[in-house]
Amino acid sequence: MVGRLYRVLSCTEYLEGKRHPAPALKLTLYNVIGERILEDQRVPIDTGYEGSIMLTSELYQAFQIAELPRTLWRNYRTLTGAITMRMARGIVEIDDMRFECFVESPLFGKGKLLIGRELLNRLTIVMDGKRKQSCIGRLEPGNNPKKFNP
């Protein structure tokens, strides 16, 4: 049997949902000139969203100073059709980690506040549905077994 041991660094309570609680992570978000735009905000996790962080149109305005050229904006396919997303650089802080990421907001429409797979794939996360918590973890040193190949 192959296993790994992780140390939990912090946990965030799930958000209340219409039918079911929603996994979330607590983050602080800065624009590239260092202005704090969100502080210790619980943001829903959406594994169906491929980008890093989606923002409402209102929040996105604080990031327009570092907006990427339109040729680099992304298009996503949804059930209702293609959506063009404006993109800018931002800085996210989750627990003791701080790194640059992309923030996006729909060119048309209001947008939502979401954490997507591009950011999630940079983290070790346990979504503990029974306890209704999303936890950030770190692999214990010297505890990285080789992949299991039967």
List PLM regions with ranges.
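Pepsin/retropepsin-fold aspartyl endopeptidases
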Residues: 1-150
